[in-house]
Amino acid sequence: MSSRTVGSLRHRVRAAALQALFELDQTTHDLDSVVARISDDEMFSAEGRDFFARIVNGAWVNRQEIDDLIAKIAPSWPVHQMPGVDIAVLRIALFEILYDAAADKAPVKAVINEAVELAKHFGSDNSGRFVNGVLSTVVNKPESEE
């Protein structure tokens, strides 16, 4: 598969993951049923289904730790008051950067760029800048401060 095809697949998967995480956060729907339904609706390839399930499950399972990290980095913005799109985008990106151990893991810069693009497209006028600021702080933070 070409890098352009992989990139567009990952973009589609991340956009669908944003939808799934937003839905999970706003409803009482079951994780497995949301993942199955959206994955079926999107008609992903096997590779796309695997990536989708990995990032949605990973971001959702690790959301408390991810949210705690966001709260430390952006104390003026309580996580429970953040727009749902922003928090979903941050959960996806921070899962990929900090928790994803897959061999085909995307480079950090690619994850940040994609997160900023998703935030700009689906979020408010300030979402892209906010997401970029949080992710840049995480990536540039010395390990001794974590």
Swiss-Prot record:
Signal peptide: none annotated. Pfam families: NusB. Keywords: RNA-binding, Transcription, Transcription antitermination, Transcription regulation. InterPro entries: NusB-like_sf, NusB_fam, NusB_RsmB_TIM44. One of its GO terms (cellular component) is cytosol. GO terms for molecular function: RNA binding. It comes from the Bacteria. GO terms for biological process: DNA-templated transcription termination; transcription antitermination. The keyword rRNA processing does not apply. Involved in transcription antitermination. Required for transcription of ribosomal RNA (rRNA) genes. Binds specifically to the boxA antiterminator sequence of the ribosomal RNA (rrn) operons. PANTHER family: ANTITERMINATION NUSB DOMAIN-CONTAINING PROTEIN, N UTILIZATION SUBSTANCE PROTEIN B-RELATED. Belongs to the NusB family. This is Transcription antitermination protein NusB.
